[in-house]
């Protein structure tokens, strides 16, 4: 089980648990992790998913303001380490194990 945690932003400290994948966005109709209060986040902004080999991968879902990892814009989906911060809109998040 993984935990997606808001490190800083409008919902500081908020967490969501997931096993295989989680979609992050502003619209709870399409996003499992819904952050409605950050207007820089798209309806369906990014997805975290576990690959067959167990690694986590982060994908931007053609969001308007992009997804940033290590200060750079995310292009193609790429692996992300546990605890590694990433930014969507004005919100910084990370994934840990529960």
Labelled PLM ranges:
Residues 1-6, 12-13, 52, 91-98:
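Regulatory inter-domain linker segments that are low-complexity and enriched
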């Amino acid at each position: 089980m993984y935990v997606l945690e808001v490190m800083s932003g409008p919902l500081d400290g908020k967490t969501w648990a997931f096993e295989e994948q989680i979609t992050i966005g502003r619209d709870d109709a399409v996003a499992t992790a819904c952050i409605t209060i950050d207007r820089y986040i798209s309806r369906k902004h990014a997805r975290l998913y576990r690959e067959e080999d167990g690694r986590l991968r982060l994908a931007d879902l053609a969001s308007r303001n992009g997804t940033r990892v290590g200060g750079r814009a995310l292009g193609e989906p790429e692996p992300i380490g546990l605890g590694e911060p990433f930014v969507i809109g004005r919100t910084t998040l990370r994934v840990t194990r529960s």
